[in-house]
Amino acid sequence: MIKNYIENAHFEDTGFAYTLSLISGKHKMVILYCLMEFETVRFNELKRYLKTISDKTLSTNLKELEADKLIVRTEYPQIPPKVEYTLSERGKTLMTVLDQLCVWGEENRLTE
């Protein structure tokens, strides 16, 4: 029965594939964890936390996370411009899943 299901499955339409599409990429999970830990973070603070990320890559990741409604971007009308990022309520619900992934990774990491 399971073999038949797998043979006929469209994994791109599953919740699993959808969730992976939201968090795929080198930096998205780290960005989400920074926002969970520090709650409200500005662009340059994220850049400092991530160290090796370029402005373009960080900007792209933030736009994608915002489009997926995992984070909230708040822009303040002042000079110089001030923009802050926080986890959305939807993003907060994802963090429990990511925590479990991290726990599994720590418990099952292969050592040489």
Language-model region placement:
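Generic recognition of well-ordered alpha-helical segments
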Residues: 18, 48, 60, 96-99, ...
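Generic detection of well-ordered alpha-helical segments
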Residues: 25, 29, 63, 92, ...
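Canonical helix-turn-helix DNA-binding module
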Residues: 47-73, 80
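Basic, amphipathic "hinge/linker" alpha-helix immediately C-terminal to the N-terminal HTH DNA-binding motif
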Residues: 77-100
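Short, Lys/Arg-enriched N-terminal segment that forms or immediately precedes the first helix
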Residues: 2-20
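N-terminal helix-turn-helix DNA-binding core of bacterial DNA-binding proteins
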Residues: 14-57, 84
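Alpha-helical linker/hinge and terminal dimerization helices associated
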Residues: 29, 68, 97-109
